[in-house]
Amino acid sequence: MRSVRALVSGHVQGVGFRWAVEREAGRLGVAGWVRNLSDGRVEARFEGDPDAVEGAVGFCRGGPDTARVESVDVTEVEPEGADGFRVR
């Protein structure tokens, strides 16, 4: 099990980024959540199989076509025991 926090910077709000992350996390079988931050970034928590978590982080690095990702800062964190994945 791997658990990470990802902070995504760039043009990532108002472009469907969170919903695209939710779909990709579901496809990968990753648990956690994603939300907008007041400073314009998006924060996500991913928990699950290490390869699946890496896939979710990789998706954030590219994002949907409507987004322009400038950077993704990833930090290893303690698991929250999330069940499923949701947009906050």
What are the residue ranges of the model-derived segments?
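Intrinsically disordered, low-complexity, mixed-charge
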Residues: 1-88
